[in-house]
Amino acid sequence: SQLVEKKNLTYQNFKEKENGMNKASVMNWNYDSVKHFSPYPVLTEKQIKSFDLVICCADNLDVRRLLYRSNIPWLDLRAQGRNCAYISYRADRNKHDVLLAGPEGSFSCQGDSWDGSTEGQHFSHIIAAGMGAEWIHRYFAKDDVADFKVVNV
């Protein structure tokens, strides 16, 4: 969903007062490093076919399906508890149904038991971002890039 939902509060770094608000807008207000944003709901492949690369950080199974079945280069970043991964358009298409499995396509960043404090917080979402940044750099430098990578911390 594009809106903060109650289920997001425990694992996507949102606060109770942000429940029901647009996720992109909340990110813009909360992070000084976000200089410009423009919510862009993706509903069809036609909307993204001109992009050089699509980076997916969605918790929406329909968006992932659209991307995985497209002919557009993409990178999907995921984090769940102490695990993180990236999956690229180069991954074996026969395995996409397995890669798309999960409850409503959601993959937690801090784990279901995260209470909002930083004590014992899992930082797998930061690891996923770092791995993704390296992959993107290599992709645009025309270096070899991996199909996927999974890390357990």
Where do the model's predicted regions map?
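Adenine nucleotide-associated cytosolic modules
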Residues: 1-153
